[in-house]
């Protein structure tokens, strides 16, 4: 039987190591590897992912799927998914909404998640056999049951292009909610749902590494995480919410 508590400690250690490295480089002149359309990549993204992968590999034999460097080897039943810096644009512009995100997957299901909000030294974590926590404090999803009382967090993925009709449908959906937020980090959006700060996160065409850890933590917090339409490049459609709005 998989020892999820032990793997959780490994993921927490790697996330903290990655987050501390990012903090050490915050405010420095950063090398931009790619700036195209709505997407941007830093050398720091790649360097941080390498550090996290080394930490995970030194303590486990699972393969690793990373945003920046792809697969370490063929995927097995269990594998790590890593986003070394979710919210790169925010980080580059000194907007303190970014994080390190690490998930353990069983086939296509996130079973463990760690998200380190290094800007505030907040560590979120949980797995399928545990509660969800912010540092040492348990967190749970909210009890709001109506959209017109609730907050939706969403986004427009950098590599997704919406038709006019799709944009129209999105705006129509926004009108059902009390508040709508776009914060530039899918992982942080998921955490807001897990911690009861928002009721729903949804985004189509988002990459798996941005939402996998959040999915596991939302479910550990008593919520519902739906990941559908997984594509060959690991884009997915994600909806995370509380129990009331899932029905």
Predicted region positions:
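N-terminal subdomain of lithium-sensitive/metallo-dependent phosphomonoesterases centered on the IMPase/IPPase/PAP
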Residues: 1-85
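Residue-level signal for inorganic ion chemistry
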Residues: 22, 45, 56, 88, ...
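Acidic active-site catalytic centers that drive phospho-/nucleotidyl reactions
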Residues: 45, 67-68, 83-86, 90, ...
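DPxDG-like acidic metal-binding loop motif
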Residues: 74-133
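A structural micro-motif at secondary-structure boundaries
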Residues: 134-138
């Amino acid at each position: 039987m998989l020892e999820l508590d032990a793997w959780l400690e490994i993921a927490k250690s790697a996330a903290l190591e990655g987050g501390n490295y990012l903090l050490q480089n915050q405010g420095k002149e950063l090398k931009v590897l790619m700036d195209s359309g709505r997407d941007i990549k830093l050398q720091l993204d790649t360097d941080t992912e390498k550090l996290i992968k080394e930490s995970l590999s030194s303590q486990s034999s699972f393969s690793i799927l990373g945003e920046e460097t792809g697969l370490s080897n063929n995927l097995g039943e269990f594998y790590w998914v890593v986003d070394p810096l979710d919210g790169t644009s925010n980080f580059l512009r000194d907007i303190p909404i970014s994080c390190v995100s690490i998930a353990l997957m069983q086939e296509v299901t996130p079973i463990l998640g760690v998200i380190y909000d290094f800007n505030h030294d907040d560590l979120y974590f949980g797995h399928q056999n545990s509660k969800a926590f912010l540092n040492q404090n348990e967190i749970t999803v909210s009890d709001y049951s109506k959209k017109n009382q609730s907050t939706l967090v969403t986004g427009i993925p950098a590599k997704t292009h919406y038709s006019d009709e799709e944009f129209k449908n999105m705006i129509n959906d926004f009108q059902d909610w009390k508040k709508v937020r776009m914060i530039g980090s899918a992982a942080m959006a998921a955490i807001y749902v897990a911690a009861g700060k928002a009721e729903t996160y949804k985004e189509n065409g988002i990459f798996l590494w941005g939402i996998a850890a959040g999915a596991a933590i939302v479910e550990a917090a008593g919520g519902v995480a739906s990941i559908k339409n997984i594509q060959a490049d690991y884009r997915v459609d994600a909806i995370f919410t509380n129990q009331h709005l899932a029905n």
